[in-house]
Amino acid sequence: KRFSDGAQYRFEVPGIQGPKVMSALLEEMDRYDINLHRVTQTKGIMLLTDNEIIEMVKLAKQGQTDLILAIGPRATTDTSASVHTEEGVRMGYRLRGQEQIVRAIEDVKRAVAFGCRSFLVYDEGCLWVLNEMKRAGELPVDIHFKVSAHAGHGNPCSARMLEIIGASSINPVRDIQLQMLASMRQAIDIPIDIHTENPKSTGGFIRHYEVPEMIRVAAPIYLKTGGSVAATHSWD
């Protein structure tokens, strides 16, 4: 399996939270003559001003890279106390209540109005309703939805379910093993996004030595890099 241009892999840099750092990143990519295919913001659209979104969309077009903006509403910024407990943390970033679904949709619609077409999704129900809106013509037909590693998926059955309800690519759990990755690839056709390195908050492990095998068993694959310099998922 391959990308539409025949490539087996592409590069993605996550955790690019605003236009200033995005501009610096793209300048370095040019300096080293490296093609960057994706830039992902993780803190949430709701934490960006209109002008910041406009500038990031502009930079993406100039740099010929895809910009992925994260849906802002999530359990950790909701009023729930449970997510901050040892047991409750297992709910991840999923949305609680229909009101949060509505807010997430409005977050996406705001960014769409400024030209963004790719979004990072944390909640399966939110993914489903956004895809239904796409099918109904309420969102652009060229919109893409990337499922975050924070959704906690790591098996072929879950991967297939996500593909069915609208995922354009899937980021499995960060410590997924090669044989697990291979089984996911057998179940789906959409790209898989894989962390080749990780922030300290999610283990800090570096998997560069596994990259050739990742490509062999899981292409088409987005190789995510740059995470080991960050302290946390939404680090500035």
Predicted regions and their residues:
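Short, glycine/polar-rich helix-capping loops at beta-to-alpha or helix-loop-helix junctions
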Residues: 154-158
